[in-house]
Amino acid sequence: MFDLSWSEIALVGVVALIVIGPKDLPNVLRTAGKWVRKIRSLGSEFQRQMDDVMRETGAEDVRRQVTTLARTDVGRKIDQAIDPDGKLAASLSSVPPPSPAGPFGTSPAAPPSLPPQAPAQPVPPATGAAPPSPSAGPDRRTDGSLPPQD
């Protein structure tokens, strides 16, 4: 009850022997034993009275019913009352395949398709030459220098 080991009990005995003394120690132990016996008898009497009250009020039947209910699987009984044949559970657990028709029995609208168009200009292959600079005009070269004067 107190979770005392033998070494702890021996330590308490040695301390009691030193504090109380060898002359009075037997009388103290006898008195402590009487108190423990009296406390135990009061506890057992209280337990007996509570058992009698439970029997008189029918609480024993209630306790038995609660124990019986605790053993039964209430969740399974509820499932059987809601879905006795199991069709609802089967429909919820399986995913239906997607239907090709839309929600109202029509086929879904296809996205508008554009006719293929040819590119406006062919893209020249990269040659390593720099593209013309925006400052290059009719009298400027692509590298930005002026052409020779005639």
From Swiss-Prot:
It comes from Rhodospirillum rubrum (strain ATCC 11170 / ATH 1.1.1 / DSM 467 / LMG 4362 / NCIMB 8255 / S1). One of its GO terms (cellular component) is TAT protein transport complex. The chain crosses the membrane at residues 1-21. Belongs to the TatB family. This is Sec-independent protein translocase protein TatB. Residues 77-150 are annotated as: Disordered. Keywords: Cell inner membrane, Cell membrane, Membrane, Protein transport, Translocation, Transmembrane, Transmembrane helix, Transport. The lineage of its organism: Bacteria, Pseudomonadati, Pseudomonadota, Alphaproteobacteria, Rhodospirillales. The Tat system comprises two distinct complexes: a TatABC complex, containing multiple copies of TatA, TatB and TatC subunits, and a separate TatA complex, containing only TatA subunits. Substrates initially bind to the TatABC complex, which probably triggers association of the separate TatA complex to form the active translocon. Residues 77-86 have a biased composition (Basic and acidic residues). HAMAP family: TatB.
